[in-house]
Amino acid sequence: MEEISTPEGGVLVPISIETEVKRAYIDYSMSVIVSRALPDVRDGLKPVHRRILYAMEEKGLRFSGPTRKCAKIVGDVLGSFHPHGDASVYDALVRLGQDFSLRYPVIHPQGNFGTIGGDPPAAYRYTEAKMARIAESMVEDIKKETVSFVPNFDDSDVEPTVLPGRFPFLLANGSSGIAVGMTTNMPPHNLREIAAAISAYIENPNLSIQELCDCINGPDFPTGGIIFGKNGIRQSYETGRGKIVVRARFTIETDSKGRDTIIFTEVPYQVNTTMLVMRIGELARAKVIEGIANVNDETSDRTGLRIVVELKKGTPAQVVLNHLFAKTPLQSSFNVINLALVEGRPRMLTLKDLVRYFVEHRVDVVTRRAHFELRKAQERIHLVRALIRALDAIDKIITLIRHSQNTELAKQRLREQFDFDNVQAQAIVDMQMKRLTGLEVESLRTELKDLTELISSLEELLTSPQKVLGVVKKETRDIADMFGDDRRTDIVSNEIEYLDVEDFIQKEEMVILISHLGYIKRVPVSAYRNQNRGGKGSSSANLAAHDFISQIFTASTHDYVMFVTSRGRAYWLKVYGIPESGRANRGSHIKSLLMVATDEEITAIVSLREFSNKSYVFMATARGVVKKVTTDNFVNAKTRGIIALKLSGGDTLVSAVLVQDEDEVMLITRQGKALRMSGREVREMGRNSSGVIGIKLTSEDLVAGVLRVSEQRKVLIMTENGYGKRVSFSEFSVHGRGTAGQKIYTQTDRKGAIIGALAVLDTDECMCITGQGKTIRVDVCAISVLGRGAQGVRVLDIEPSDLVVGLSCVMQG
């Protein structure tokens, strides 16, 4: 290796390459941090933004004037202040003018400045811009020595180290940037709330962050949306870091055919709507989110943001919303990092820090402005006094000037004879003849008076820190009054810790109806009006000529509904997964929801809150066979189904109830037999077993239902001709499994066979439904409590050609 020679007059100093790399990287890092990525806490601007606004101010591109080509603006910034790429300057200029990027844009754009959908702005040779009116407050008083200036990159000009910034840019518009080893991500806020917080701080500098939070509710994003939870907001205000969950704002519209459409009118901050629509479409095509028929971005200047998600008929909008929030940016987290430069060094800042540093900056600006104005006023009053003296002795002064050979001699004589100084003498010799009028003399005397008052006011201001703070407070209030507006982002207290369907679905009692031909729907219980015993009922379904309601059940929207078919297979759905329909609609076919074979019917429905090994599904077949299986055996059933009960040839499953191990059950037959027995008499079995004999039947009798015994309740039976009664459980003694049971009802042709039974409280209501779709909702207390052998009372006045086919208890709450 060739030996390096020592330069003439120089010294070679050996250094460690590791040390040099570290030093160079730190220098580079600090350059990026200070000169590029992080905003100054005082005016809230990064250097490129500050240079853009200052260059536009220097070129007179104020709001009252015309716009100028962005190419010219970018060129001015590059040539005088920012020796970097033109793309970075133009990108920064564009962002300052986007109303979806900044809460209060400081650039007034002309032309295509990009869209929220990610469309790029037009090239800078096509677009124009000028300062927005609010931006003028950022540079106001900059000519009054309110801020310090430094030489530009080539010493050909000077640029401000900070702008006067009467408008609290950092709090109002936030900031984002990535430096070396650090990043900032500060949210925007509402200007009126910021002004209130600044006023509160000025009045009481010792106030707590919580008291500041009483003024500033939270971030206010330009794209609106809804913030969920206040913990993240509070944490970010107290520590400078926090996570804020934002969701899109939406409405749900239903067309005449019952199809729902979800319309999003606001999205979380910084969400690209084009990518969002593409993401929703991909999820819909991949069947990750089911039920979406179409999605369109209908955003326009006339309608504003509008993303339309059309759903297939029968699809619950709440379920789709849940998936959209979970799998797309329609719910996003804004990670707050309040990092800004304080005296040239990056610092993590609390809300109070941000307010304090802004107030301190404005105090410095107001103070420096007052000193400048005081100096200018003193200089002017010095001249005005001289001019007034000169006008009072105008004849002598005119004679003196006329007899002077040149200007310098005239000024010398003025100094000697009238005791004027150089500045005053120069002003007198420069005075125009029009100033000799009486009106001008009076004007000077008025100006002298005004200047005297101004000087007194400024001197008083500079000696009173409280008055300086008062000016800061007033000017901030004036900005808020001029440019402040209502909040765009709402805040709700609910925290979102995890996403679940139930988070979006109101708990509500639903009536689930299944027709003989397999149509299923859910209808809110509130849709049925209460009627007295003997009422005519109201239509519950608009069914085909040969169809009729065969099953009716009530459950909460958050419950699981287990369907057990005539062939002994089990399926389940969440209640909200069953399409909701009006009372007159027939609903959706069961085969569109469950994978039910063509030769099986839903014959039993069980509602349960959760699957467990402590609870059982107790099933009964038409031929009296019973079986008990823990509910956790059915976790995987879902819509594809699994075996629940192995049936003998010709037998069908007719009923099932949810029981605990210690419960007693009662089997009731169509011809009026009731067997009360202990549930322990039936051992726990696996899903593939056939069950055991539960009740001994005659050759013509069949099981009509099975109940869980509760002494607080009574047995309610209903016959096919609309007669019913209540009987106390205490009238039945416990018998062994496989016995015939006791009499509960005597069947007659006029009243018909038993079609169903319920265990009810006096405060319950029951619902009956006929094969022709008529329903009646009746208070249980209106149905008489009778003995085991009584025939019952008329509950439903039905047509001779109609029969009661279903009975259900309507749960309260």
Curated annotation (Swiss-Prot):
Known catalysed reaction(s)?
ATP-dependent breakage, passage and rejoining of double-stranded DNA
Catalytic activity, EC: 5.6.2.2
Q: Name one GO molecular function term.
A: ATP binding
Any Gene Ontology biological process: DNA topological change
Q: What class of enzyme is it?
A: isomerase
**Residue ranges annotated for the Topo IIA-type catalytic domain, each copy included:** 38-504
Q: Where in the cell is it found?
A: Cytoplasm
SUPFAM superfamilies on file:
GyrA/ParC C-terminal domain-like (SSF101904), Type II DNA topoisomerase (SSF56719)
Q: Quote the InterPro entries the UniProt record gives.
A: GyrA, GyrA/parC_rep, Gyrase/topoIV_suA_C, Topo_IIA-like_dom_sf, Topo_IIA_A/C_ab, Topo_IIA_A_a_sf, Topo_IIA_dom_A, Type_II_DNA_Topoisomerases
- Provide the leader sequence positions: none
In terms of Pfam families, this protein maps to:
DNA_gyraseA_C, DNA_topoisoIV
Keywords of the record: Antibiotic resistance, ATP-binding, Cytoplasm, DNA-binding, Isomerase, Nucleotide-binding, Topoisomerase
Q: Which residues form the active site?
A: 126
Position of motif GyrA-box? 531-537
Its Gene Ontology cellular component terms are:
chromosome; cytoplasm; DNA topoisomerase type II (double strand cut, ATP-hydrolyzing) complex
This protein's assembly is summarised as: Heterotetramer, composed of two GyrA and two GyrB chains. In the heterotetramer, GyrA contains the active site tyrosine that forms a transient covalent intermediate with DNA, while GyrB binds cofactors and catalyzes ATP hydrolysis.
Q: What else is known?
A: Few gyrases are as efficient as E.coli at forming negative supercoils. Not all organisms have 2 type II topoisomerases; in organisms with a single type II topoisomerase this enzyme also has to decatenate newly replicated chromosomes.
What does the function comment of this entry state? A type II topoisomerase that negatively supercoils closed circular double-stranded (ds) DNA in an ATP-dependent manner to modulate DNA topology and maintain chromosomes in an underwound state. Negative supercoiling favors strand separation, and DNA replication, transcription, recombination and repair, all of which involve strand separation. Also able to catalyze the interconversion of other topological isomers of dsDNA rings, including catenanes and knotted rings. Type II topoisomerases break and join 2 DNA strands simultaneously in an ATP-dependent manner.
**Family affiliation:** Belongs to the type II topoisomerase GyrA/ParC subunit family.
Question: What is the protein name stated in its UniProt record?
Answer: DNA gyrase subunit A
Record gene name: gyrA
